[in-house]
């Protein structure tokens, strides 16, 4: 069974007789236990479609496609990719998928165009500055969207589940990257929260894939 979605991970855990918890659940409980209870126990929250989610998913796919091509083929091949078209196609696909799920439109052409243009500019900046973040010398792409499904220390019947956006190996050192998009920049609290997520993923990645933490 290929583990491509949170649902896949949850199904695998259930087959093992275990329950799952994601980082988003952990974070929600940490910030407000009552909110966590309402969402995951009482099931009183509903899915609210958002252009931010659509853009984030599409941008993930675009950057991951670029990096996958760069490391598996070459920098030249990655540079030849029509990343703008990849982004646009992914945004359209994700939007149509969510509209089908929720049964109504939740954005408009103007807003979609604005987010698309933001993505184009971000990718343009990234390609110009890529070398400062991702080099090829002594560097290996370990995986993209690598699954984590591992028993927690506090309860052997509960497993942490998640996906690692990008995992690199540089000079025999593992690096985990989590792609984030934001329209408001990154304040200290947001950076700290992202750090919590990466530290948790690092710990469980080391256990599951048998590498030094």
Question: What are the language-model segments listed below?
Answer:
Residues 1-21:
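Long, acidic, intrinsically disordered low-complexity segments
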Residues 17-31, 158-169:
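An acidic intrinsically disordered interaction segment
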């Amino acid at each position: 069974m290929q583990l491509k979605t949170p649902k896949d991970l949850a199904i695998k855990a259930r087959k093992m007789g275990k329950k799952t918890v994601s980082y988003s659940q952990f974070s929600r409980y940490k910030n407000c236990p009552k909110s966590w209870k309402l969402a995951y126990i009482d099931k009183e929250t509903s899915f609210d479609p958002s252009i931010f989610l659509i853009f984030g998913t599409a941008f993930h796919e675009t950057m991951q496609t670029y990096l996958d091509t760069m490391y598996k083929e070459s920098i030249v091949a990655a540079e030849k990719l029509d990343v703008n078209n990849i982004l646009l196609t992914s945004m359209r696909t994700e939007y149509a998928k969510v509209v089908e799920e929720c049964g109504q439109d939740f954005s408009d052409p103007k807003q979609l165009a604005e987010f698309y243009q933001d993505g184009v500019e971000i990718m343009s900046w990234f390609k110009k500055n890529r070398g400062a973040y991702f080099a090829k010398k002594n560097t290996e792409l370990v995986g993209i969207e690598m699954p984590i499904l591992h028993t927690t220390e506090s309860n052997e019947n509960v497993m942490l589940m998640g996906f690692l956006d990008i995992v690199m190996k540089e000079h025999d050192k593992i690096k985990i990257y989590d792609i984030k998009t934001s329209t408001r920049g990154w304040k200290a609290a947001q950076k700290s929260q992202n750090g919590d997520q990466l530290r948790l993923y690092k710990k469980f990645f080391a256990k599951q894939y048998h590498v030094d933490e």
